[in-house]
Amino acid sequence: MIFFDKLHQNISQNQSLLFVGLDPNPEMMPGRYSSQDIIDGLWDWLQFIIAETADFVCAYKPTLGFYEALGVPGLELLQKTLAAIPSHIPIILDAKHSDLNTSTIFAKTVFTQWGVDAITLSPYTGQDHVAPFLVYPDKAVFILCSTSNPGAEALQQYPTRESPLYLQVVQESKNWGTPEQLGLEVGTTNAEVLARIRQVAPERMIMVRSIWAEGGNLNRILEVGLNTDGNGLLIPVPQDMLASANLSKEIQSLRAEINQVRDITVRDVASCSVWLPDVFTVKQHPLHDLILQLYDIDCIMFGNFVQASGAVFPYYIDLRKIISNPQVFNQVLSGYENIVKNLTFDRLAGIPYGSLPTATGLALRLNCPMIFPRKEVKAHGTRRLIEGNFRTGEVVVVVDDILISGKSVMEGADKLKSAGLNVHDIVVFIDHEQGVKDKLQANGYRGHAVLTISEITSVLHQAGRINDEQFLALTAE
């Protein structure tokens, strides 16, 4: 099962956002276990914690460093502990892994041999370090973006408090993986830090740490960190509570306290959305995050650009860049797939050159054959107009990137029809919306678009990515 599906299932089943740190810390071990051999005592304590909490938490988080500090017996203890956790409860290995050279083999070890569901990573070696962990489709990572350690403040707040490094980490890490692959780890007692992170990453799961230290305010943490559904946060069980002989009773009380605040928060957000829709966007566009990512990787640029049609626009949309960002490309393919899977056809056809990678990826996803009409016919070789195998009379869905005038995509469709193929549907990622779909229909084609330019501009403007002047320039077209 995919990690976040497994996590949400446990959140719902146990009505809990709580996770437990399964850390064999001799300094925190209750006195009732101290008369035994230290490893045996820690093992008995960890078994007690699991038995007392399994019905009241959504995840377990063993910290690798504590087990490593105990040497070989500690790693053996880790194996026993992982095996003792009920299989339906997700395991987040707190490793803070940061070594690029060992990332591939370590990912294989923790995910395939140890069987953990997610892992914490340090961000500073970048996407190359994170990528080996993301190739496991049912697993996830949590990126450390902030810690509560006072000594880290000089780094985290650099260069200014208005534009701190920890927010840049959040912004950059969003491009490394989808919300279904990548969450954030935030250690802080400062609700303002969490609020700023939530504002930048409204769609991400956040695992908070250190909130029970002096100065922490649980209600405020929940208020700024929860999403509109009362989820989106993972809350740690206090370490000192794990030493209690009445752990089960105490954790149920904490769960009830958190759920009470969750209920209030959800009601408050719902009421605000009715009266202040321009301020609190409770119901976001389904592709809200993708639109922002397209802007952030410069697929949308401003200036005076001459389009292929000859028209001059105050912006340019360059979707070719998506192939260099696997996470964004994957989301774009999903958008196309949601449309194409409902159509009747025999083959896909990409229009050269911009949509060929998209059509290829889509064909692989849908397990269907692909062809494409050549932009120009070679003067040598087979001189084919259509590349790829096909049979006369087959139905082809045409895939292109953007509809501006419709001229190039209809030229491609006409080439396909001249070879004896039938074309009824044209699917694009962005519709420029100047009556081009009507033009397609007048020529016998049904037009479909994942997004319209007005949807994109609306999301970018509401999110503060573009200013009023840019918004007007886009909407005036």
From Swiss-Prot:
Gene3D superfamilies: 3.40.50.2020, Aldolase class I (3.20.20.70)
Entry keywords, A to Z: Decarboxylase, Glycosyltransferase, Lyase, Magnesium, Multifunctional enzyme, Pyrimidine biosynthesis, Transferase
Keyword Glycosyltransferase: yes
SMART domains membership: OMPdecase
SS bonds (residue pairs): none
Pathway assignment: Pyrimidine metabolism; UMP biosynthesis via de novo pathway; UMP from orotate: step 1/2; Pyrimidine metabolism; UMP biosynthesis via de novo pathway; UMP from orotate: step 2/2
BP GO terms, sorted: 'de novo' pyrimidine nucleobase biosynthetic process; 'de novo' UMP biosynthetic process
Cofactor: Mg(2+)
EC numbers: 4.1.1.23, 2.4.2.10
SUPFAM superfamilies in the cross-refs: PRTase-like, Ribulose-phoshate binding barrel
One GO molecular-function entry: orotate phosphoribosyltransferase activity
Region (OMP decarboxylase): 1-273
Domain of life: Bacteria
Ranges where the record places region Orotate phosphoribosyltransferase: 274-477
Keyword Endoplasmic reticulum found: no
List of catalytic residues: 96 (proton donor)
Binding locations of 5-phospho-alpha-D-ribose 1-diphosphate: 374-375, 378, 380, 400-408
Family per similarity comment: In the N-terminal section; belongs to the OMP decarboxylase family. Type 2 subfamily. In the C-terminal section; belongs to the purine/pyrimidine phosphoribosyltransferase family.
Function statement: Catalyzes the transfer of a ribosyl phosphate group from 5-phosphoribose 1-diphosphate to orotate, leading to the formation of orotidine monophosphate (OMP). Catalyzes the decarboxylation of orotidine monophosphate (OMP) to uridine monophosphate (UMP).
Protein name: Bifunctional enzyme PyrF/PyrE
Organism annotation: Nostoc sp. (strain PCC 7120 / SAG 25.82 / UTEX 2576)
Gene this protein is translated from: pyrFE
